[in-house]
Each structure stands twice: as C-alpha cells, then as structure tokens.
Amino acid sequence: MLKDKKILITSGRTKENIDPIRYLSNNSSGKMGYCLAQAAIDLGGEVTLISGPTNLEIPKGLKNFISVESALEMYERVNEFFEDTDIFIACAAVADYRPKEYKKEKIKKSDSDLIIELVRNPDILFEMGKKKDNQLLVGFAAETNDIKENALKKLEKKNLDIIVANNASTMGTDSNTVEIIKKDKSSVEIKQKNKMELAYDIFSEVISVLKKGKNE
C-alpha cells in the first residue's frame, strides 16, 4: 500500500500572537489531519506529522511528531522535510495573515478603536507546488460557497495532484461530506462519513494516482 513511502502531513490550526494574551486563530480541531496520519501509518507509510495546537492524542505508531504554533513555524518545518517526501498532505488550517507587529506587553484597553495591521503569511501549499519535483501533493479546500469551482482553481494554481473539497461549516465536526478531485478533473463524492473512514477513502485515491503514475 504505502510501504517505503515518506508522508508529510500538516494538521491543526495556527496561532498568530498579537500580544502575550491575545492571538488570531480559527476553529479547526485537527481531527482530519490526525486521522490521515493514523491511516497512513496503518497502511505502512513512514509519517511525519507537523501539527499546530490541538487537543488530540498523537496517532498510534507515529514516530515523527513536530509541534508548531504559527504559520511561519509550520512553513519552515515543511520546507525542512519536503525535499525528502513522497506525499505531502496539507490539511492544516493555516492563518493567511499575521499581525505585522507583536506587542511584548498586553495591549491596554482605551476609549479609541484598536486597529491591528496584518501582513500575509506564506502560502505553504503554493510554495511547495512551485518546488514540487516527484512529490504527490494533496490539498484541502474548505469553502463557504462555489465549493467545487473554488477547489478546481486551487488545484490548478497550487500545482496539486488531488484536492479535497468540503464545506467550511464542518470544521471541528467528527464527520464530513467531501469531493475528492484529481488533476485530470475526475472526482469522487463521499457523503457523510466519519473522518477516520474519510482518511482511508482519501488514501485510496492517493494510491490510485501513485499506481497510475507507475504505469505511465
């Protein structure tokens, strides 16, 4: 199945600190990424999991777990492992922006509005798509509208082999409905399965792409 394959997975959310008390983040639980890591281990893969903050237990049998907090930290660690990776699955909910300036002391409340200037974080998957050699890249598109249309745009723009499209409202839940879309635009819709089952379904498509590549 995935024997001798090196699989790099990102999961969880990122935290972008504003001051020692406040930060920017999102509602991602990290469940999907952790389920993917567990499925990859069960299928014989050599897995590295780079995770932002979660409340989850580390997958059984995982040998390489890397904890990060910010998007920049995650970007640096992905860069570190990407070259020696066969399959990269970007499942983390990474902040698009971070505060331009971190305040070392708590920002005090005042009578005026607080304006925080934000700057863009690196687009990890886009950057890896540019660096891609023989790696198979899998991305996720959590959208609120025009789900498939937006997923197809990401698939092409980020040079992906597979994208998993779903409704952003399912973030943090135990189950999901997704559409798995391949580079050739063929797709499989999977309705309302728990995330562990979905993880195996996603790897089924990954394995089919790997097999197709060998036969070409």
Regions found by a protein language model. Name each.
Residues 1-216:
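A cross-family phosphate/adenosyl-ligand binding-site feature
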